[in-house]
Amino acid sequence: MSVYNPNDADFAFTLGIEEEYQIVDPETRELRSYITQILEPGRTILREQIKPEMHQSIVEVGTRPCRTISEARAEIVRLRSAIAGLAARHNLRIVAAGTHPFSSWMQQEITPDERYHMVVGEMQDAALQLLIFGMHCHIGMPNNEVAIELMNVARYICPHLLALSTSSPFWMGRNTGFKSYRSVIFSTFPRTGIPPTFHSASEFERYVQLLVNTGCIDNGKKIWWDLRPHPFFGTLEFRVCDIATKVEECLALAATMQALIVKFYTMFEENTTFRVYRRALINENKWRAQRWGLDGKLIDFGKRKEVEAKALVHEIVELVDDVVDMLGSRREVEYLLKIVENGTSADRQLRVFAETNDLKAVVDNLMVETMEGVPAMAFEADVQSQAAHS
């Protein structure tokens, strides 16, 4: 069983987290196109862990590969603190939410990079309006065949994870009626959504090669499914989630993804696994998740009936109960139950707006929640540590 123990050398199921933050002016609460000014000093401190995105009002960070959720916690706290500190040098703040409540994509500057301008040239307004912010979680894989087997099974759980992560109810100053409007916006891109199934890694590789040969893509990174085998990292990458506003929400989601993959792998090894469902059926649940979040019902296709999304979260926690202690993530996984009780970021944003009728108040609350659990002095300590080792 050493393959399941994070403390053993052959543990395969590492995790890494990527987050995309908004750069916000605390006076106007609007997005600010300022990544260029943040990037240079940021790379001095964070090196390859900070990246630009297509819009200059977005900054992306990524953790190092972590064996445990405790390691990931330290990384996320450090990264949020560092980016917040870099932004504060320019009197700016960061926000973790899937969309900005009112800033317009038509007023955002594009990062001066040939790659991004090529994307805009090809995708036009679909690219320009991609002012959205997600959380991606990479789970290490023993090999490519296992990655495909686990992707086929884990597709089913993507709508549940989306419902738990919703943080984008507003778009262009309007309540969209969706808990995750980010996922609606992203659906305008090709090769997005729930992935199809593949019988083997070689079948998947032939699919990618066909797209390359026919000029659709230049490599597998332009396959943007909600769950994909990463073409370079050797991971299975969950891409379905809105960015989590609170650190605890981020860690709960990441820990759950790792635990689910380990659970599915144990079932795979024991020759017992979940039924693999059609993409068309899973898409029904995804639409419900992005529309209603945890307040809606998802379809249990095994039982052929609707079930409250909140009840299904309890089932997820029960499903992974026998692996979380080994992974050291019981506290983080059980935080899902607090999300069920208190609501997601989208729910809180809607409550603030209902109380204030002011989208700026929504941004104010997001700025506070983004830094919840991040020590105020962590950034300066990190700067000093990096300087001492540079």
Swiss-Prot record:
The keyword Nucleotide-binding applies. Keywords: ATP-binding, Ligase, Nucleotide-binding. Pfam families: GCS2. InterPro entries: GCL_type2/YbdK_subfam (IPR050141), GCS2 (IPR006336), Gln_synth/guanido_kin_cat_dom (IPR014746), YbdK (IPR011793). Its EC number is 6.3.2.2. GO terms for molecular function: ATP binding; glutamate-cysteine ligase activity; ligase activity, forming carbon-nitrogen bonds. It is an enzyme of class 6 (ligase). ATP-dependent carboxylate-amine ligase which exhibits weak glutamate--cysteine ligase activity. This is Putative glutamate--cysteine ligase 2.
